[in-house]
């Protein structure tokens, strides 16, 4: 069965979950995710939360294939671009509450962003059309490695030193993590 279909079915199954069905739930979850419980591919850590309490947690598969290190329920994962949807959702909630506008200039919230003579809006940042250089490209050129600890202060410093844009805001699309670091700050 397709893994994405399995996840969908799992979500569908969970909506009808009650506390008295915990053993049945455990068996159903194990059955659904056993495809990831191997030593030859990455896996996952899973927690099911109901009414603010963890009702199920388990790990499946391997965290580090090279060293055969298993995933545990407390394994930490790099969330990466999965966070972008939550960042934009948060910005849209703030807009709905009247606390900001997608047309606001990022410099209104983060004055460290240089004035490039062109307004960079929150919309530009959220849609990868800001023209800013990507933070990971800049970091790698500066000798940083992907597994180095990188703080928002590091990113803001990189952005503040940027001399020009790759293109005028809104004119082109270029995937840019920098925009989401800035949106997260807002």
Predicted segments with their positions:
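Residue-level detector of alpha-helical secondary structure
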Residues: 31-35, 50-51, 90
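Well-ordered alpha-helical scaffold segments within catalytic/enzyme domains
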Residues: 183-186
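Generic marker of residues within folded, mature protein domains
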Residues: 8-10, 36-38, 69, 115
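Active-site-proximal loop and beta-strand segments within enzyme catalytic domains
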Residues: 62-177, 181
């Amino acid at each position: 069965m397709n893994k994405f279909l399995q996840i969908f079915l799992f979500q569908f199954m969970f909506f009808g979950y009650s506390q008295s069905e915990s053993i049945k739930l455990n068996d159903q979850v194990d059955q659904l995710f056993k495809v990831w419980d191997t030593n030859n591919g990455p896996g996952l850590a899973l927690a099911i939360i109901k009414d603010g309490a963890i009702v199920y947690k388990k790990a499946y598969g391997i965290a580090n294939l090279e060293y055969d290190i298993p995933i545990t329920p407390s394994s930490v994962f790099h969330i990466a671009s999965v966070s972008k949807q939550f960042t934009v959702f948060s910005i849209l909630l703030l807009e709905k509450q009247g606390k900001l506008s997608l047309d606001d200039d990022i410099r209104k919230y983060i004055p460290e962003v240089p004035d490039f003579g062109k307004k960079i809006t929150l919309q530009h940042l959220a849609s990868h059309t800001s023209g800013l250089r990507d933070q990971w490209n800049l970091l790698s050129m500066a000798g940083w490695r992907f597994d180095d600890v990188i703080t928002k202060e590091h990113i803001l410093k990189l952005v503040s030193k940027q001399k020009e844009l790759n293109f005028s805001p809104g004119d082109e699309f270029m995937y840019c993590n920098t925009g989401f670091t800035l949106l997260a700050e807002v």
